[in-house]
Amino acid sequence: MTKDDYQDTILVVIFLDSRKREEKMKKISLVYISLSGNTESFVTRLKAYLLEQYANIDVEKIHIKDLVKEGEDFFEMTNPYVAFLPTYLEGGNGVDNGDVEILTTPVGDFIAYGDNASKCFGVVGSGNRNFNNQYCLTAKQYSQRFGFPVLADFEMRGMLGDIKKVAAIIAELYELESL
């Protein structure tokens, strides 16, 4: 075997090894909307935590607000995803009135687009507990509308415990391997 043959063999092994690693990668998609920055903060910290804790994953963040702002068309998801939804409602108390979603409706439109609803593992709701019955009400409404579960909830920007809880749920849904 010549020196050139040996180098070609190394390149082939490296190429095959990288293809093998790509095949094992699991794509995790986090679909969300953030208006005040709270949900953006949570999803960004969740992505970092997932990448630190689990092997062979690629975490994709899809911010619906950016799609709408840039005039991009909705698209069909090719893989399962988890939706994150803050609560914005018209006044009221969430029982007798004040249960009409405002500002976050593009998330519902995205989920309803094509076959996206069937690919959604579920929704993680966020809000402010000061609003009592309205806390995460939109996530509960989406659960009823689309037939998927409310996986978890967090208040405001969420705490590390919330990140860990949601990460554990995602790890189970995607069958992830810890590092």
PLM segments and residue spans:
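FMN-binding flavodoxin-like domain, especially the glycine-rich phosphate-binding loop
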Residues: 77-179
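Short amphipathic alpha-helical "recognition" segments used for binding
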Residues: 7, 11, 24, 169, ...
